From Swiss-Prot:
Sample GO molecular function, one term: protein serine/threonine kinase activator activity
This protein's name: Protein TCL1B4
Species the sequence originates in: Mus musculus (Mouse)
UniProt superkingdom: Eukaryota
Gene3D superfamilies associated with the record: TCL1/MTCP1
Disulfide linkage: none
InterPro entries: TCL1_MTCP1 (IPR004832), TCL1_MTCP1_sf (IPR036672)
Length: 120
């Protein structure tokens, strides 16, 4: 009898994320998410068209830094203050922009969401 391979169970992505600090968001379960990386590129693995692509990498963190870095204040100030999950793979920002959930994974215990600005 062959052993079956078991993969860790991924929780559902958050229903909403509310900005509590410049680069920190909180979900409906009180979990903290940090905007770890923002990429702006015309050549991205997430973009299929030739256009500017904005992707945000959010990491669920159990321990946060006390103070935001000065660089994050400049880099992330254009992100929406709130994201709400509208469908299985689309978030709507407080600014009415749509963000596509392109990846929800876990790597070495860190849960990650990758959102891409959808240019509808």
């Amino acid at each position: 009898m062959a052993d079956s391979v078991r993969f860790p169970c991924m929780p559902f992505p958050p229903c909403f994320l509310v900005c509590t600090r410049d680069d920190i968001y909180e979900d409906e379960h009180g979990r903290q998410w940090v905007a770890a990386k923002v990429e702006t590129s015309s050549h991205s693995p997430y973009c299929s068209k030739i256009e500017t692509c904005v992707t945000v990498h959010l990491w669920q963190m159990t321990t946060l830094f006390q103070e935001p870095s000065p660089d994050s204040l400049k880099t992330f100030n254009f992100l929406p203050r709130t994201w709400r999950l509208e469908s299985r793979n689309t978030y709507r920002g407080a600014d009415a922009m749509h963000w596509r959930l392109v990846n929800h994974s876990q790597f070495y215990g860190t849960e990650e969401l990758v959102l891409m600005l959808d240019s509808r």
